[in-house]
Amino acid sequence: MNQEDEIKFLQRMVVEGSLSRRKFLAAAMAMGVGSLAPTLYSSAAMAAPKKGGRLRQGLTGGATSDVLDPGQILDSYMINLQFGQIRNNLTEVAASGELVGELAESWEANADATQWVFNIRQGVEFHNGKSLTAQDVVDSLNHHIGEKSGSAASGLLTGVESVKADGGSKVVVKLSGGDADFPFILSDYHILICPSNGDGSIDWKSGIGTGGYVLKEHDAGVRSFTTRNPNYWKEGRAFFDEIESLGLEDPSARTTALRTGAVDCIQKVELKTAGRLGKISGIKVIPTTGNKQVTLPMRTDLAPFDNNHVRMALKLIIQRQDWLDKIAFGYGELGNDNPIGPANIYRATTAELPQREYDPDKAKWHLKQAKMENLSVEFHAADTAFAGAVDAGTLMRESAKAAGINIDVKRQPNDGYWSDVWMKKPWSACYWSGRPTENWIFSQIYAADASWNDTFWKNDKFNKLLVQGRAELNPEKRREIYVEMQKIVNMDGGVALPLFLSDVMAINDKIGHPEQLGNNWELDGMKNVERWWFS
């Protein structure tokens, strides 16, 4: 590290609040830049987090049907409100991708990872002043377990046999099989800790949590207002006094709101205008690359998608580079009909799983095998699924003609898309933010019993490998299993996955943020509200 890099490192420590003025000046003196030290420190101190102000943000994915039940969280608006503002998990994926403790200070497993003990953080209070206990954690986890739970996270916890409190500060979770990634699962945005009602249920209706902000007003899908929790247990987090979250589904409306100063930050910047937006004075466009993915789920329980030859034909008529250029405007990379992305460690290489290319002749062959040479299908899309989803459908319609396939693109309204179209229509547009581990995304979306198995796909070999991979502690063997699972999804699954997308957000230049931003979800891992500040 040269002197310039060392100075930047010290300044970053000042910004993050981990280096005092005295220590900075002493370090600068030792480096031989003592005369410049006060100026260098002042510039860093000015960028350091400061409390105060109201952050106004334009979010997508809200609906008037949204509820405060964490098990029913569907999209960005409620993820940000519940996961990012008012509640906490046991664990958290840091901006670095490392798993750290949130309401669990630490955890340990037995030798085969079939039992996990979580040590619950002491001195934490809910917004109503109630102290956090192990029983709150037990009831919050059980809220997502069992056939009657109805939680979208139930598929993640099917292997849980029991959750019990061991005194007031320990929670013991026993699993039916080993799961080396189980603590990662508990960072899922559904598995939030709520106060226990004392009868085994939790109080989710009040919106009470342990998070950095307290819910004051909530008009589902339209507007929410929170204020800083004065007793927040995290040091160096939650700097804004107030948060106003607005549901802005239309990308042009979001952009206009930012340009006119009606909001301070927006998510899902319209990719075709991102370059121009970034040139406007006072606005900063920030792309982050992770596992966010465009998917086109086909319901494999309904004709004609119950025939894998049809599914393969539709995967083969997508001109992926066209999508990257014309839909993503270069913000992303090609997908290969499997959900394991660039931020996952066991991703199959192109040598292991060759990139699928546009091949209308091969698509014709598959349709001939299915005896459906003149296939006609409907594709349902709305821009809330992903920016440009309807345009993508049009591109696909044109590229499918060479294979003799007629695709009727049906534009759907943004409002109600996730409740009325996704998982209801036979073929639709969707997106996923990806997951930190292979087991997580496979268990939540591709397992036969997953509540979000939006293709209704069931593959016995895949599901057996899922259990094996989850319990395997040897990294090399684990990789072999997950690569094989990716091949199965690629060749048999009900999802066409053309692209991995960068998350592109835009902020006004008055907002300060850490140098490293989380890429596990949008908006700094959906923790922007507690990680950012006004400069």
Regions found by a protein language model. Name each.
Residues 84, 94-98, 186-238, 242-244, ...:
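Gly/Pro-rich hinge or "lid" segments in bacterial periplasmic/extracellular proteins
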Residues 119, 153-196:
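Surface-exposed binding/hinge segments that line
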Residues 1-19, 23:
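N-terminal secretory signal peptides
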Residues 356, 402, 408-417, 441-509, ...:
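Extracytoplasmic/peripheral linker and loop segments enriched in polar/acidic and small residues
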Residues 507-535:
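Long beta-strand-rich cores associated with HINT superfamily self-processing modules
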Residues 231-276, 397-398, 406:
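Ligand-site clamp/hinge motif
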Residues 334-369, 386-389:
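Structural transition elements
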Residues 58-111, 142, 208-210:
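N-terminal lobe/hinge region of extracytoplasmic solute-binding protein
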